[in-house]
Amino acid sequence: MDRIICVVGPTASGKTKLAVQLAKLYDGEVVSCDSMQIYKHMDIGTAKPTKEEMEGVAHHLIDMVEPGEDFSAGKYVQLADSCVQDILSRGRTAVIAGGTGLYVDSLIAGRSFAPVPQTGRREALETQLRENGGEAMLARLRSIDPEAAARLHPADEKRIVRALEVYEETGKTITQHNLETQAIPPRYRPVWLGLDYSDRAVLYRRIDLRVDKMLEDGLLDEIRALLALGVSPKATAMQAIGYKEFFGYLNGACTLDEAAALCKQRSRNYAKRQLTWFRRNPDIHWLRLMGTEDFSEVLSAARQNIPFSAF
């Protein structure tokens, strides 16, 4: 088993706090596995750990990319794998923490991704999408890769375009590409720890309180500052939960209470999707929390599932 600990679970479950304490105990460094904390200038809405919360523990893959830039799972795997290799080479523990399931699974599996398309290919497909619509593009994908098409809806425009460009670029369907990469043995053998709450209402309450705290901490000013920097509301980073829900309020289309309620609901729905994703992994040791226990109890329960020694 590699000296790697993966701390996963839904949003607002306490992953950051546990990861920091485990890193301190096991001479580790934290590798963020959050698709939005990778962006600069987006601190409050992505719940980035503060310097105080980091407690002197080195954190990687936070504040790496400008919010107007595109970022992908493939790029994440390249950066994160380099971080993990460096940490392990120094005899330390890599604590991978976050809730972006595709990222962490791809990193641990050592999954390769289809190559970036040639210049102009994606733009051509996006033009065809605008001219013909999602239904027509999905029908085209169905004739090439019926399995991939069956998993998509006409509104899944980015995924339809991606599936088509993979086929045009490689001559292989995205389904075939995924099957080939899944057949490769995992790159790493980590300890998996998952955080969840026995009473779902406790998790939802934590999510609601987090949104309230974000607003108190200046989330609206953060969004205004991003827009002032010229970041498009349609940019991938700005489509994150915690940002796009407040565009309506800033444009005068709804009240702040309505925007906050929408953000809370979407965050709860996201938490459900995260749990569904991670529960497919039989290697995760789940820590079922009540929400009333002392953190030392959570840490003790986590340590019982870690086979290597602390420092």
Residue ranges and their predicted role:
Residues 1-311:
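Phosphate/pyrophosphate-binding catalytic cores of soluble transferases and nucleic-acid-acting enzymes
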